[in-house]
């Protein structure tokens, strides 16, 4: 039975895990790392790089290196969050035909789901390489506070990557699974998850295989990226004061600043001070300029103090919704790379009145939880019951633009809820049902998930027709809405059409593009491997010919030289053809056989001569000079006596 993998699709880094017996195992990628940067780059020659290779070239190719794409997934272009993000990244964020936020690289537009799919493909390949078999099913994690559009877009990304997404699971819930799988006694825990781009807080009751989420809260635009940008802004402003040059106008310098900020942030988690040193960051008429600055932990903490404080209100709201006090929380589990920051740990300690639990790896625990959930779905992990909640209230817009809730936030999912509505005018034959998600009292202030028209209502006075609207939330937290005209008995099963999002046709096209790209990537990799093998063979053949060319006939020597030249030509073209290189590699190997044979025979002859010489030396050495003493015979002995 094929394995189901667990993937933590992160803002900054992603991680893949699989059940190995009773334990979740994190799989190392091709570069030997346990996490993979969530970055995709497009080079000048059309090559697509994912993960560490993309990160390595980001400084020289900032406009076509896409990172923190998770912050855009499921968002519209006009969303204030998107507009804020536009000013923070060097790449282009553009408006798609459906109003969604897309990104652009080398003049081509991509949806965030497409870019996320490229990262998921990398995780899929990592798992396949380890398992030695095809992987087609996965459990993917999302921030607990993701809305329906963001969850649907994540599921679309999985489909584009060629994965059947069995379940979308909330990140704090996944972390709780990994933390509490072996815990038998009942506990109330809080999972404080501050990652690269999002913040979640979940309160759970766990014990004896049951994981029940009591409440969840968070901020989908608060994480390590914001901490990095604070430091970038500070470095740029200090440099401007000293040199009078604004580095924020230079995308290449900005990318170098971002990398330096991330490195400094990490170093300050374990040391009190760090030095940022960026030579040749820019230049003016007087010559090149260098940025050198010492940064203390205290200064960094003061720069990001308000960001850390922004996590407190969601924590208090989650505790209130769960009906527990901070003192009643038995354990606070830290998740996400940012929780390594001492100031964050100190804030959590002050808020909950206890030392947070640091026994899990904050970068890997979410992927491990996803793998455990995959094991549950596959039947490999027994006696585990997971009860999650919907993070935001769901409802429809009613008369006067009021948001009428059908399903309150923190309702256990899956769930189904119906409510009867009616018409606002006499003889109204159609109603538009606008579905929203959020906590504000007016529908316009919440996230519009979609709308649909229910037509064919028989003429009647206002308030008479009875229209039953049913909300159905599945275990992934994804919403379906249906409507039924109770007067006529006609039922309308309506699949909600998101106000943005990808259509089925677009997803299908992207799936085909991804498959084509995977094939192109495979061919490119085969080309590189064939080229490496060919260059190695050319080098060894030239060396052998130079040293032993006199051992073969002129005809054979010429054949080898021609084969080397042909293989060199095949390798040196801009778009090497793997099949052509392989064929010419085989030709060179065949014609070189006579040279190899001649070298072997010469070695055999030399070895035979050496053996004969050694034997001759040994036979000469067998003559031994001996000391002797003369022994007189019996008569001589008698006479001398």
Swiss-Prot record:
Disulfide bond residue pairs: none
Sites where Phosphothreonine occurs are at: 198
Task: Outline the segment boundaries, as ranges, of region: Disordered.
Answer: 514-554, 604-641
- What InterPro entries is this protein classified in? ATPase_NBD, Chaperone_DnaK, Heat_shock_70_CS, HSP70_C_sf, HSP70_peptide-bd_sf, Hsp_70_fam
Give the induction note. By stress conditions e.g. heat shock.
Say which domain of life the source belongs to: Bacteria
| Alphabetical keyword list | ATP-binding, Chaperone, Nucleotide-binding, Phosphoprotein, Stress response
Comp. bias (Acidic residues): 622-633
Basic and acidic residues bias spans: 514-529, 540-554, 608-621
Q: Name one GO molecular function term.
A: ATP binding
Q: Does the keyword Phosphoprotein apply?
A: yes
What's its job? Answer: Acts as a chaperone.
Q: What PANTHER family does this protein map onto?
A: HEAT SHOCK PROTEIN 70KDA
Q: What protein family does this chain belong to?
A: Belongs to the heat shock protein 70 family.
According to UniProt, the name of this protein is Chaperone protein DnaK
This protein's encoding gene? dnaK
């Amino acid at each position: 039975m094929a394995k189901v993998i667990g993937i933590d699709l992160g803002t900054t880094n992603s991680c893949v895990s699989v059940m190995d017996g009773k334990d979740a195992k994190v799989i190392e990628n091709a570069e030997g790392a346990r996490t993979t940067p969530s970055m995709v780059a497009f080079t000048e020659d059309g090559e697509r790089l994912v993960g560490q290779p993309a990160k390595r070239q980001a400084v020289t190719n900032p406009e076509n290196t896409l990172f923190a794409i998770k912050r855009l997934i499921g968002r519209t272009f006009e969303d204030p969050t998107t507009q804020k993000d536009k000013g923070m990244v060097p790449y282009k964020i553009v408006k798609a035909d459906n109003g969604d936020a897309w990104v652009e690289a080398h003049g081509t537009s991509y949806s965030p789901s497409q870019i996320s799919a490229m990262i998921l493909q990398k995780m899929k390949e990592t798992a396949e390489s380890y398992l030695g078999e095809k992987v087609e099913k996965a459990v993917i994690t999302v921030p607990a506070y993701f809305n329906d559009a963001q969850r649907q877009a994540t599921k679309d990304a999985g489909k584009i990557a060629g994965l059947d997404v069995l379940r979308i699971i909330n990140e704090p819930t996944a972390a709780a699974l990994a933390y509490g799988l072996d815990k038998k006694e009942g506990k109330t825990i809080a999972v404080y998850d501050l990652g690269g781009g999002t913040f979640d807080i979940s309160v759970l009751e766990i014990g004896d295989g049951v994981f029940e989420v009591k409440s969840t809260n968070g901020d989908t635009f608060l994480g390590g990226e914001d901490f990095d940008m604070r430091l970038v802004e500070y470095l740029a402003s200090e440099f401007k004061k000293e040199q009078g040059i604004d580095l924020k106008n230079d995308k290449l310098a900005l990318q170098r600043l971002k990398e330096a900020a991330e490195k400094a942030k990490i170093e300050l988690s374990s040391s009190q001070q760090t030095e940022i040193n960026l030579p040749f960051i820019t230049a003016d008429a007087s010559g090149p300029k260098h940025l050198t600055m010492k940064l203390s932990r205290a200064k960094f903490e003061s720069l990001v103090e308000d960001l850390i404080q922004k996590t407190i209100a969601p924590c208090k709201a989650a505790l209130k919704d769960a009906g527990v006090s901070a003192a009643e929380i038995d354990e606070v589990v830290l998740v996400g790379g940012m929780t390594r920051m001492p100031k964050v740990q100190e804030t959590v300690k002050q808020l909950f009145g206890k030392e947070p639990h640091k026994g899990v790896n904050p970068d890997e625990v979410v992927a491990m939880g996803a793998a455990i959930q995959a094991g549950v779905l596959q039947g490999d992990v027994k006696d585990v019951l997971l009860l999650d909640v919907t993070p935001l209230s769901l409802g429809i817009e009613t008369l006067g633009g009021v948001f009428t809730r059908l399903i309150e936030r923190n309702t256990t999912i899956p769930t189904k809820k119906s409510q009867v509505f009616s018409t606002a005018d006499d003889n109204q034959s159609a109603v538009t049902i606008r579905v929203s998600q959020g906590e504000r009292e007016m529908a316009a202030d919440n996230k519009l998930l979609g709308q649909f028209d229910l037509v064919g209502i028989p003429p009647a006075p206002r308030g008479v027709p009875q229209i039953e609207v049913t909300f159905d939330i599945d275990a992934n937290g994804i919403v379906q809405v249906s409507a039924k005209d109770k007067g006529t008995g006609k039922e309308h099963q309506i699949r909600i059409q998101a106000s943005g999002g990808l259509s089925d046709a677009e997803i299908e096209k992207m799936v085909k593009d991804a498959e084509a790209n995977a094939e192109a990537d495979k061919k490119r990799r085969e080309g590189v491997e064939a080229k490496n093998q060919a260059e190695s063979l050319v080098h060894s053949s030239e060396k052998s010919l130079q040293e032993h060319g006199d051992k073969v006939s002129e005809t054979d020597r010429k054949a080898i030289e021609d084969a080397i030249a042909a293989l060199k030509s095949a390798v040196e073209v801009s778009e090497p053809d793997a099949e052509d290189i392989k064929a010419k590699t085989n030709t060179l190997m065949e014609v070189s056989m006579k040279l190899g044979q001649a070298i072997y025979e010469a070695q055999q002859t030399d070895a035979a001569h050496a053996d004969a010489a050694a034997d001759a030396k040994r036979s000469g050495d067998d003559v031994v000079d001996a000391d002797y003493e003369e022994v007189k015979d019996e008569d001589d002995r008698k006479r001398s006596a």
